[in-house]
Each structure stands twice: as C-alpha cells, then as structure tokens.
C-alpha cells in the first residue's frame, strides 16, 4: 500500500523531498585497491586473521570462524604501540575458556594502535569480531603483501575445505 502511495506521490514530492525520489540513488564511489591504499576490502590469512586497510592503516582482527572455534574470549595479550612486525610474526594471543590461540601479523608494518577496550571487555572479540572486537591497527609497509591474502569469497571456500 505504501509503495502505491509513494509511486503516485513520489514524482510530485521528489523535488521537495529528495528521499522520496523513485530514482535509485548511487552512493559515492570510493576507489578500492591496494595501489592507492585508500580503502581495501577485508582480506584474510590462513591463520584466520583479517585486515582491512584505510588510508594506509590496517585494522586487524580474527575471523568469525576463529572466534567461534575459540569460544568465549576471556583474555587478550596485545603488543605495545610502536612494535615492528613482519608478515606472519606472532604479535599476541587470545585466551578463551576452551583454548589459547596465538595471533599472527597479516602484513609487515608497525603497530599504531591497540584496542584498549579489550582489556576490560575481551568478549568484544566474540560479540563483534569485525567491528568493535578489532585487535590492532598497523602501518602497511609492503602493500604487495595484501595481494597474497585471501578475499572474503576465497576465505569462505578455504573454511569449507578445512571443515570437510
């Protein structure tokens, strides 16, 4: 019913209220890619860490698969800001009621920030592993290393292959 009203009144109201326009609104496009390092899609390692890069800074966390496998995270050990990491270097650990798991750097770079909220609330890793439960932020010294990581689709296929 509301659709019919909008369809009839949309052309009349659209000039006064752009939100009622029937034309699809195209969102602003931001260039994606490792060349500019403005914004990259989330990439994954075979050790279940992810990284998303914006303006040359990578945000690192663990995948949903990893947090489900770990169970309730009760403690996070993270590096100090300024720590220099090479790709695949161990940079910390997560402890859960089930197990402990080391964390590995997806890229070469320097730690610029840690998620201090995890000290008081490590369960954020479980509740919001791709948003509030991020672990560290780091510079991206070798952008070509991003190409060695898996896309989200490739990671999902990887997960299915190890589950079978």
UniProtKB/Swiss-Prot annotation:
Gene3D superfamilies: 2.40.50.100. CDD domains: GCS_H. Its main location: mitochondrion. Pfam families: GCV_H. InterPro entries: 2-oxoA_DH_lipoyl-BS, Biotin_lipoyl, GCV_H, GCV_H/Fam206, GCV_H_sub, Single_hybrid_motif. Binds 1 lipoyl cofactor covalently. GO terms for cellular component: glycine cleavage complex; mitochondrion. One of its GO terms (biological process) is glycine decarboxylation via glycine cleavage system. Residues 57-139 form the Lipoyl-binding domain. The keyword Coiled coil does not apply. It is found in: Mitochondrion. Keywords: Lipoyl, Mitochondrion, Transit peptide. Belongs to the GcvH family. This is Glycine cleavage system H protein, mitochondrial. The lineage of its organism: Eukaryota, Metazoa, Chordata, Craniata, Vertebrata.
